[in-house]
Amino acid sequence: FEADYPGWLGCVAHVGLLHLAQARITERIARQVGDDTFAEQCAEWVRLGAQAMEDRLWDERGYYLNFFDPVKGIKSEFIFGYQMDGQWVTDHHGLPSALPADRVRTTLETIKQTNVALSASAATNYAMPDGSPIRKKKEGTWDYGRFSYFPPEACMLAMNYMYEGEVDFGLDLARRMWENVVCTHGYTWDVPNIMRGDTDTGERVFGSDYYQDMILWSLPAAIAQQNVSAPCQPGGLVDRVMRAAAK
């Protein structure tokens, strides 16, 4: 994940699901403009992509492999804690999931028992299948460290749980992450990009003033298990803020 080790090759769970989410969005756009032929093509791409993820990446231990390159015969069995980002995209856009519901629930439960359990403030980028921290980087390569994570990714993961009905768990995960950023380390107006990985202190290792952390404002819709349009409707959060500002 943006690092030499373990790297991403071939079929990648995180990237694959994001592409399927993009195809879902494009399918809806095509239907809205009356291009049913292209919409059906997008739907078929989603079906085929989801089947490829099932056939090549699903691991019976309850998650999608980090990656699998069928040409080179190389795979990474690390559990990527944020592999469900594409699921958040479809949920937040009010679109059908690209993956079977039981796979989504099982994967999130696995991440809860591994990546989330390894971090005092969010969820580690990676975990071993047995729930232990990943091995240290290989000689001559670099990585972010065994306990690293990105705050906006943690927000998306929290919303994954909310959209799957685990609102309290998702809220607590988001709270722990923001409490670490704002209260523990005082990064309130200097929001970080990535947290320290060599030890589980929750300190920033890189980045400041990262606007991707404004994903915070996506939480109200997820808490209510609504899509992104809901806060903009009459009486929604955005509508109330704008009316209050006009007074």
Features from the language model and the residues they span:
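Short, surface-exposed recognition loops and adjoining beta-strand edges that mediate ligand/DNA contacts
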Residues: 47, 52-81
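Active-site core of glycosidic bond-cleaving carbohydrate-active enzymes
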Residues: 6-7, 16-17, 21-32, 36, ...
